Amino acid sequence: MREIVHIQAGQCGNQIGAKFWEVISDEHGIDPTGTYHGDSDLQLERINVYYNEASGGKYVPRAILVDLEPGTMDSVRAGPFGQIFRPDNFVFGQSGAGNNWAKGHYTEGAELVDSVLDVIRKEAESCDCLQGFQLTHSLGGGTGSGMGTLLISKIREEYPDRIMVTYSVVPSPKVSDTVVEPYNATLSVHQLVENTDETYCIDNEALYDICFRTLKLSNPTYGDLNHLVSATMSGVTTCLRFPGQLNADLRKLAVNMVPFPRLHFFMPGFAPLTSRGSQQYRALSVPELTQQMFDAKNMMAACDPRHGRYLTVAAIFRGRMSMKEVDEQMLNVQNKNSSYFVEWIPNNVKTAVCDIPPRGLKMSATFVGNSTAIQELFRRVSEQFTAMFRRKAFLHWYTGEGMDEMEFTEAESNMNDLVSEYQQYQDATAEDEGEFDEDEEVEEA
């Protein structure tokens, strides 16, 4: 089978990772002890993608939990599915990264990285045919961002032909933990542009807005935000976990979604949006699902897709529904909004349907868009970065760990280049390809 090895790094990465395992274990009928209690063969048909079958018929997640301090991992271990993980796969330091990317990437994290790679190697060796790795982390802290990107580049060295996917939580001024988040995020994006194949940008600002506006939660907690993240992660991995034809592995998804290697930052969306513990009374119709999942309010990245154009889109519908109706509605969306899809990639919207809906819903839809509007998110981080960097504010925390200012300057310009590339393809039309060829050569040099 085509296995995926999951890594969660840092506080945020471990919290959303733990929620991800709770949600998909439930969908596959696996209880907190790793025992199967399901009612459908579909639940087990591709269980090997994310789980190892251990002795006594127990299913163990192919998960590695990493942090530079023990706190979050202790709470994962004490949490509802804490006992399902393999105890040897908890790898943690004691010092913490103090929200400092340099500590995660160059000093504290670098000391721990070899013991993490040993565990990753062991997991990879138990795979029959490893398709790739997925990492959950945030870009604003120290461990998930600094050590997370260090792990990515080390894994890239050792497994250059395997797919690397990240679920990256991008910082936002509305839900901010520390003032240096723009530094950590820019340094991380600098790494992700070069070293990942697919990055799902999950944005705290968008999650906060969804909780506040759509779900009417007056005071959203991280628990509420993480509920949305886990629903989205469950949705985008549906094709990988259940039998189906379309985007059934990470590589096929990448081939469909990434027209240019650097432009692999996706905007996820989900419909219907529900709050934690709520039951939905009325199943949405296929037209409603389709309309909602393309709606800017349902995007997990704080960017408005109407400010850009879609290069590619993947949609995953879940539940019992008419395939014909799904196809009609998806065509309908494209025809009505054709100006928002680039015309120089024909058939750039792909749709998959899976019979098994998520818990508590009759039908749901998950949206993955590669939109040029994602540049808004990088622009936002870049502006905050520049404001501090031009005064060299807080830089001593980074140079004190051995970093050079030059690395900041490079990261800043790489992110600004990324923004310009998105802009370039947003403005492109089918006719004027001649001009691009020359640009391309300059960039390669």
Swiss-Prot record:
Cofactor: Mg(2+)
Record field: compositional bias (Acidic residues): 429-445
Record-linked InterPro entries: Beta-tubulin_BS, Beta_tubulin, Tub_FtsZ_C, Tubulin, Tubulin/FtsZ-like_C, Tubulin/FtsZ_2-layer-sand-dom, Tubulin/FtsZ_GTPase_sf, Tubulin_C
Keywords from the named record: Cytoplasm, Cytoskeleton, GTP-binding, Magnesium, Metal-binding, Microtubule, Nucleotide-binding
Primary role: Tubulin is the major constituent of microtubules, a cylinder consisting of laterally associated linear protofilaments composed of alpha- and beta-tubulin heterodimers. Microtubules grow by the addition of GTP-tubulin dimers to the microtubule end, where a stabilizing cap forms. Below the cap, tubulin dimers are in GDP-bound state, owing to GTPase activity of alpha-tubulin.
Regions annotated as coiled coil: none
Sequence similarity: Belongs to the tubulin family.
Positions bound to GTP: Q11, E69, S138, G142, T143, G144, N204, N226
Localization annotation: Cytoplasm, Cytoskeleton
Glycosyltransferase found in the keyword field: no
Subunit structure: Dimer of alpha and beta chains. A typical microtubule is a hollow water-filled tube with an outer diameter of 25 nm and an inner diameter of 15 nM. Alpha-beta heterodimers associate head-to-tail to form protofilaments running lengthwise along the microtubule wall with the beta-tubulin subunit facing the microtubule plus end conferring a structural polarity. Microtubules usually have 13 protofilaments but different protofilament numbers can be found in some organisms and specialized cells.
Domain of life, per lineage: Eukaryota
Residue ranges, annotated region (Disordered): 424-445
GO MF terms held by the record: GTP binding; GTPase activity; metal ion binding; structural constituent of cytoskeleton
Pfam families: Tubulin, Tubulin_C
CDD domains assigned: beta_tubulin
Disulfide bridge positions per record: none
Positions annotated to bind Mg(2+): E69
UniProt-recorded name of the protein: Tubulin beta-2 chain
Alphabetical GO biological process terms: microtubule-based process
Source lineage: Eukaryota, Metazoa, Spiralia, Lophotrochozoa, Platyhelminthes
GO cellular component: cytoplasm; microtubule
